[in-house]
Amino acid sequence: MKSVATSSLDDVDKDSVPLGSSINGTAQAETPLENVIDVESVRSHFPVLGGETAAFNNASGTVVLKEAIESTSNFMYSFPFPPGVDAKSMEAITAYTGNKGKVAAFINALPDEITFGQSTTCLFRLLGLSLKPMLNNDCEIVCSTLCHEAAASAWIHLSRELGITIKWWSPTTTPNSPDDPVLTTDSLKPLLSPKTRLVTCNHVSNVVGTIHPIREIADVVHTIPGCMLIVDGVACVPHRPVDVKELDVDFYCFSWYKLFGPHLGTLYASRKAQDRYMTSINHYFVSSSSLDGKLALGMPSFELQLMCSPIVSYLQDTVGWDRIVRQETVLVTILLEYLLSKPSVYRVFGRRNSDPSQRVAIVTFEVVGRSSGDVAMRVNTRNRFRITSGICLAPRPTWDVLKPKSSDGLVRVSFVHYNTVEEVRAFCSELDEIVTRDT
């Protein structure tokens, strides 16, 4: 599977990329900024979207797919729990096994290379417990300062417990783009040493939406014997297909509540990483031959996990990644063109273009001289749009990297494919009214 997040957009129709975007730095011909998807058809899959408020807080959590809800309802109505060995129980087990295989294939993994958990935060903590026996105070961990706290806290905890040195990997900026932080291998290489055992970063920044060059990072990390790359994919998977084999990561984690599903996480661990580095934290009598056997503590939530298979089918077959990428690129283009047209009013963070090889549909900014929290509150209380403000559960990227002037952080607007051109244009008008007329 070709990963749009790491490729040259071979899977995207380049003639359909909208005005204001570029592919590999080359400007494209102007095309109308219109919806790429059939809005009514897509929204028929999301019952919650029938209200008057447009969800522009999707990086915090998306609405749930109808077919996923129905899958859970059907399972709980139809199957016994816990399952036994009778025909009905075996039918339930077959459904569960098929779901797990489909989820694994979604990221080009094998079924014994994935496990489910409560959240990405929880799964990284469990992974830390599993890796703990092969770490000591002579090791070093490299952690990106662009990490969401979920991708940092497990390793900070381990470093404190074991006396491990943490080296902070700062993003690169330029004098011409001081508000556009990007992770590069050039800034990573000086931090690596023969003692480095873990490098952790996110695939996409949940704060500014920038796509990081994970395969390039993996190639550098793996020049150090015994060094592993741990990637937080939460902000990537709603927007791009992911191929963990192509990325050559050791561990990759994401959350389904950001992907039109339940509050559930999935962790990938390569077979090589499992065999070389991981210790089972499960009951002594549970086989540790799979990732489930090593990390899946207690009885799994079958009813929630079965929500994932319909989501995979919807993304890959009903809508398709090509249209998802194109729709979101149009939406980002409209918002960025508005924000960047008023440089004295808005300070925009991250990529200043909508090139889908460089960013996803997360746009962060602050209003000059205004409280970000106040701006977001004024938008939200009008009940037409739902946006977020603050630190996005990422204090280091917010305060240490971006350094907003507002004492209460940033304003974040995040789209997915079910958002529309009409909504974004209306949002720009409403935001303009709020920042220019409201006091």
Swiss-Prot record:
Coiled coil: none annotated. Pathway: Mycotoxin biosynthesis. It comes from the Eukaryota. Pyridoxal 5'-phosphate binds at T120, T121, N206, S255, W256, Y257. Its cofactor is pyridoxal 5'-phosphate. Disruption phenotype: Impairs the production of ustiloxin B but accumulates intermediates such as ustiloxin F and C. Its EC number is 2.-.-.-. The keyword Transferase applies. One of its GO terms (molecular function) is transferase activity. Cysteine desulfurase-like protein; part of the gene cluster that mediates the biosynthesis of the secondary metabolite ustiloxin B, an antimitotic tetrapeptide. First, ustA is processed by the subtilisin-like endoprotease Kex2 that is outside the ustiloxin B gene cluster, at the C-terminal side of Arg-Lys, after transfer to Golgi apparatus through the endoplasmic reticulum (ER). Cleavage by KEX2 generates 16 peptides YAIG-I to YAIG-XVI. Belongs to the class-V pyridoxal-phosphate-dependent aminotransferase family. This is Cysteine desulfurase-like protein ustD. The lineage of its organism: Eukaryota, Fungi, Dikarya, Ascomycota, Pezizomycotina.
